[in-house]
Amino acid sequence: MEIFSTASFDKDFRKATKEEVKRINAIVEGLKASNFIGKPLRHAKNTYSVRIGNKRFVYNIDGSRILLIFFKSREGVYDYLG
């Protein structure tokens, strides 16, 4: 699978703690190896959220492409998604 990231995700990822980075990397490796991880988001097709501490890691799967969308606080994610 190919992995892409948004500018927003890159910015959020740079601000993440070492532990958060380890967990995100583990999730991404799991996505490459198998199937979906996390909770599907209702109003966004093929988009999933994984809780990491008090933040949410949001990604989209489209065929063989994984798009890392963002890693924000719960409020920030759901405000953004509407």
Please report, for each region that a protein language model flagged, where it lies by residue.
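Arg/Lys-rich, positively charged N-terminal/basic patches that mediate binding to nucleic acids
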Residues: 1-27
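Residues that form or immediately flank small-molecule/cofactor binding pockets and catalytic motifs
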Residues: 8, 46, 73
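Hydrophobic alpha-helical segments and their boundary regions
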Residues: 23, 42-43, 65
